Amino acid sequence: MSILGVSIECKKSSTLLTFLTVRKMTRVFNKFPDMAYYRGDCLKAVYVTMTYKNTKTGETDYTYLSNGGCLHTIVMGSMVDY
């Protein structure tokens, strides 16, 4: 079992954080198999949390990633330059 959470923070402080899940689509997000693209000019930061639970051992691994404002693509749990 694994959980991927992605948060987008816009440059304007009055703009709330936008949460993207693999099952949600809005007009600024496109969903493709195992990846999510953000399109827009308000990007300030991207925060990614990944939680993976090994179903055989029961151990849980947690990873947190953030960027400094560059546009990135989230691909299969990895953050790569876009």
From Swiss-Prot:
Highest taxon of source: Viruses
Name by which UniProt lists this protein: Protein C14
